[in-house]
Structures are given as C-alpha cells and as structure tokens.
Amino acid sequence: MIKGLDISYYQAGINLDTVVNAGYKFLILRAGFTGWGTGVSYNKDDQFETFYNQAKARGLGVGAYWYSCADNYQKGVNEANWMYENCLKGKQFDYPIYIDVEEPRWQTGKKDGVTQAIKGFCETLENKGYYVGIYASDISGFKDKMNIGDLIAYDKWVARYGSKPKYVTSYGMWQSSSTGRINGYNGNLDTNEAYKDYPAIIKNAGLNGYPKNGGGNTPAPAPTIKPSTELKVGDRVRIIGTGNGSSYGDSNTAGGIGWEREILKVYEGRAFPYRVGNSTGTTGFYKASSLQKL
C-alpha cells in the first residue's frame, strides 16, 4: 500500500516538502473542471502547473483528474480532448488519469448517459496512450450515477470514509478521508491509499507520456504484466484458461474454456490485458497464457 493525497487550487500555498516529510509518495492533481453553469465550459485548475512542477522536483508520483459534467458520450470525448491539449500534453504522469464523477446538477438520474460519458472520456485518452480510471463515491457515485457493470475495464478510485468501499469490490485506490492533517499545513486534506504499483505499470507499458521502452528506473514487471506481442486485436483465439473475475472482468461472460472468441482490445500494462468477445459484444479479460491463437 502506498499513501498519497489529492489536491487542487483549494490547497494553494501548501508546502510540498511537508507532504514528503509526512511520508506521502504521490499526488493526484486536479487538472481542471467543467463549469456546471453550462456543462460545457472547460477550465484548467489555477494551481495545476505549479503543483505538477513542484511535485516532480521532489520526486513525488503524479496523477491527475478532471471534474466532469459530462452526461453523454461526446461530452466525455470533449472533456478528454481538452484535458489532453491543455493539461496533459508534454508531461509525464506516474499515476492514472481519472474522470471525476460526482456533479449533482448534470450527472444525477442519468446513469446510461453518464456511463457513456465515462466511456467517451476513457476511450479517448486510452487511444492517446494514457492509463485511465474513474473516481467516484462508493454509493452516490459508482452505485447511483453509473452502470458499473459496463465499466469493468477501467481502474477505480473509490471514495468512502470511515470504512473501506462496500459496493465497489475491485479498485486500485481508496480515498479514505477528507480530513487528513499534516504538520506545517493548517487545513484538511484528502488522503488516499494505492494498492497497485502504478509507476511500474505505467512506465514499463510506455503510457502517460513515458517512452515505449519502459523509460525510467523502475525494474521490468513480471511477465504476466506485459502483454504478449504474439496476440493482437482481431486475432481469433480459443479460451484455454480462466480469466480474471475480480479486477477487470468475469471470464464467464466471454464463454467457457474451449470456446472460440476474438481479441477486441489490448490494454498494455495490465495483468489481464486481452479483452475478448464475440459478435454480441460480451467480453472477458485474459492473460496470454489463457488464450490459444487459432
């Protein structure tokens, strides 16, 4: 488990040396937000550039999030494109890029639309080479604002205070408190626990602005982390082993052992990188060792 904080312009003036001294290893920065007045006005966080440069100078891992108002696919795409062009481009991030889903004015009572918005955001940034994820509250977000079963492929950052998440059973990061304190800063802070070695996954997969050769000093991952180059999108495969029912999908949704399916997408850097399915669109997630190329 790795401890980190998430901050925005509300924490302007915080001395990041105090963050390092308190034992925190990463920061998730608010890159920007969509204004709730129109739901389509995009704004960079006033402290994003400052915090990014200060964090990198101190060796802190950095991720980012976008406060979303999107309630359909195209709005999700638009938010992602604006974030990329104005916040992400030319930088390197050691932690995922998240869509923050909590806006009550635009994202309440629209589960189907919000689900599509999340897909639009995540697919757009994945296609640009980013490791993406979803931030939301355990109940009021993941349960009430989206169809989580349609978003199995994406990493989850779950907010729940007082106890670990209960509705979301598979997640990479937990926001455990909004009242964290550190010496030298007179204010509350959001505290987080990461359960994956995101810097290693991201750097070795060449994502989030890092070179494809796995740039950085992080050791190479275990063989199961990096997808086999022998399998690619469009290949027909036979399922010869089980998929992953806890992190990225349920193998049973793609058919049993011995069934023939097609590789629909490859998620570099994931332990179960191959999404397979058939003409009905049902999918499951597998390692290369569980698939036989036909």
Feature-to-residue mapping (PLM):
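Aromatic-lined carbohydrate-recognition surfaces of secreted/lumenal glycan-active proteins
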Residues: 125-143
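Beta-loop motif signature
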Residues: 219-268
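Extracellular/periplasmic catalytic domains that process cell-envelope and extracellular macromolecules
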Residues: 20-23, 57-58, 90-93, 127, ...
